[in-house]
Structure formats: C-alpha cells, structure tokens
Regions:
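Positively charged n-region of N-terminal signal peptides that target proteins for export
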Residues: 1-7
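Hydrophobic membrane-insertion alpha-helices, especially the h-region
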Residues: 7-23
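Aromatic-capped interface at the extracytoplasmic side
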Residues: 20-32
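Electrostatic cytochrome c docking/interface patches
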Residues: 30-52
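The canonical Cys-X-X-Cys-His
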Residues: 52-64
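Acidic helix-start/capping segments at beta-turn-to-alpha-helix junctions
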Residues: 66-78
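Extracytoplasmic electron-transfer domains, predominantly the class I c-type cytochrome c fold
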Residues: 77-126
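Short, exposed beta-strand-loop hairpins at the edges of beta-sheets
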Residues: 129-134
C-alpha cells in the first residue's frame, strides 16, 4: 500500500512540475495608453477611474496585474482562459471602438451586474480584497 501511495504521489508531483513548463501568453500591454479606453472616452474623477481599474481592468482590459500564484499552473491557464472570455464580452481598452448601441447595452449590463453583486466576481474579490465595490 505504501509503495502504491509513493508511486501515486511521485506521479502527481511529476505532472505538477511538468505542467509548469506550459506558460500561456500573459495579458500585458506594457503600459500602453489607449485613446479608445473607457476612462478616456468618459472623463471621470481620478477616484472613479482608479476604482474601475482596480475592480474591472484585470479581466476586462489588455493589461492584467498578475500576482505570484497566477504564474503557477494550473492557475495560469484558468486565469488566462477567464481573462480571454471576459475580454470577449467587454474590453475597457476598446470601449471607443464599440457602437453607441453596444456601449449603451454594456453600460446597462455593467450597472445591473454591479447592483446585483455579480461583478466583480466573488472568486476574484476573495483574492483581491481591494477590488470589492462598496455601496
């Protein structure tokens, strides 16, 4: 029994180490400022801009502020997939390229999701306490 357990643990450890070599591309834009960015299209107080960037931009922009555990597989792949899907729905850096109709629909969706506490995701605010939105 102990031998089987050792083999299983060694195999799991080997797989864990092996998957660390698979590192998907990071969502980092090197500090580029977009003229189409939500905070450029709508002039807003610095506090509101900071709130949006802290609570929304890690998933819904072209620049994510990664923390140490985001570099460890399988978290890296899970975070990368989540960011890719989030940006397909809404990318604040590309806001100015959206049609007026899409912007209005997204604004209504943002308002509703914040009011119903669907966003930011609880799984995100669990690890990023400063991203919680207060009433």
């Amino acid at each position: 029994m102990k031998k089987v357990l050792k083999i299983i643990l060694a195999t799991v450890l080997f797989i864990f180490i092996a998957i660390q070599f698979y590192q998907p591309a990071l969502n980092v834009d090197k500090g580029q400022v977009y003229t189409t960015d939500f905070t450029q299209v709508y002039k807003m107080p610095i506090e509101i801009k900071a709130m949006f960037q802290t609570s929304c931009y890690d998933c819904h922009s072209n620049n994510t502020n990664y923390v140490w555990y985001d570099y460890v597989q399988p978290a890296r792949t899970l975070v990368g997939t989540h960011i890719k899907n989030a940006k397909e729905d809404l990318n604040f850096n590309e806001w100015g390229t959206y049609s007026n109709r899409k912007q209005e629909r997204l604004l209504n969706s943002i308002k509703e999701q914040i009011e119903t506490k669907q966003m930011p995701l609880s799984s995100y605010t669990l690890m990023h306490k400063n991203a919680k939105l207060n009433n």
